[in-house]
Amino acid sequence: MIVVVNFSSRKEGNCYRISGVIKKHYKQKRVKIFNFFENTYTACGHCDYECFKKRCLINDGINEIFKAIVQSEETIFVLPNYCDYPNSNFFLFNERSSGFFNGNKDLMNRYLNIKKKFIVVSNSSSSNFKNALKNHIQDNENAEILYLNSRKFNQNALTGTLMQDAEAESIIHDFLSSNYNLEESAMAIVFYKDKILTTVEEVYERPTLSLPKGHIEEGESKLDAAIRECFEETNEVITIKNYIGEIKSFEINFINHNNKLVKKIIYPLIFRIDKPGELSSKEERIIKVKYLNVGEFLMKCTYDNVKIMIMEAMSKRR
C-alpha cells in the first residue's frame, strides 16, 4: 500500500491535486490518501500527559494515519510552505505522534524505516523543512525532498493550477520513480586564518550564503574543478599546494532551468592560503564574495549539513 498524507487545509489547492497525480503514478497499487482538510484534528493540550502513561485521551482518528504509514510500502508527505516552514497541520501531526508511539521503540523504529518522500509546494528551498522532516526518517538518512516552485512554471501559487502544467506533473513522476539527471560538482572550502571564503548567490530569487562550487567538466578531476570554480566565481587563486584534503560528499535535489529533476553530488575539498587575493564577483548570479569569520559563517548559514561539514573541515585544516 502507498500512503499519501496531504497536510494542506485547502480542498482544491496544489497539494490536493499533487496527491491525485501520486495516485495516478501508482495506479497499479493500492493508494490511501489522507487529506487534512477532510477532518478536524485536535492539537496537544488541556491534558495531564496521559499519552506518556497509558494512552492519549483524544480520539479524532489521527492514529489511523500513523497505523497506515507503518503498514505501508512507501509514504509520501505533501506539504505547503508557510513562511519557510511546514504548515501548522504538520506540527500538530508531530505532536500527536507521542500518543501513537507511546514510548514503543519498536513501533517507532518501524515507522522510521518506512520509505518516505516529501513534496513541498514552495517558492523557496528552505532548510527548515529538512530540519522538520528529519524526525520522520532514520538518523543516517537524508530526507528526499522535492520543492515545487509555482513561478518556475508560470503559475500563481494561490490558484491551485500547478498540476495543469505538463512539465510540473512530469517532474513529480520522475521524483516518485527516482529518475534523476545526475551531476557532480566540486566545492572549494578555502580557509584564510580563522576566515572562510564565501559567496552570496541568488537561489529562488533570494540571497543565499554559500561556498565556491561548480560542475566537474568531462575529464576533469575533482581537485582541478574546485580550483577552477574558485577562481571563476571569486577571482581567488588557489593551487594544489594549498590543498589539504577532502571530506564526505553530500547530495542535493533540485529542478534546473530546463525544468528537469537533478540529483547533484557535491565533493567538498579543503584549501588553506596564507595571503588572500583581490576578490571579485565574476558571475551574474553571485551577488557578493568575501572572507567571513568562521563563527559568523556558522551563525548565518541556514543549512545544518553545511555547518557540520565546515566543522569537520576545520578539524582537518590544522
Predicted regions and their residues:
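Unchanged
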Residues: 216-240, 247-308
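Short, conserved loop/helix-junction motifs that constitute active-site signature segments
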Residues: 107-115, 137-140
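Glycine-rich phosphate/pyrophosphate-binding loop and the adjoining helix
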Residues: 128-179
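Short, well-ordered beta-strand core segments
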Residues: 74-75, 116-118
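N-terminal strand-loop-strand
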Residues: 177-211
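Charged phosphate-binding loop/patch that engages nucleotide di/tri-phosphates or the phosphate backbone
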Residues: 171-178, 299-318
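Short hydrophobic segments within beta-strands
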Residues: 5-7, 119-122, 199
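N-terminal beta1-alpha1-beta2 submodule of the flavodoxin-like/Rossmannoid cofactor-binding fold
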Residues: 1-102, 141-144, 162-175
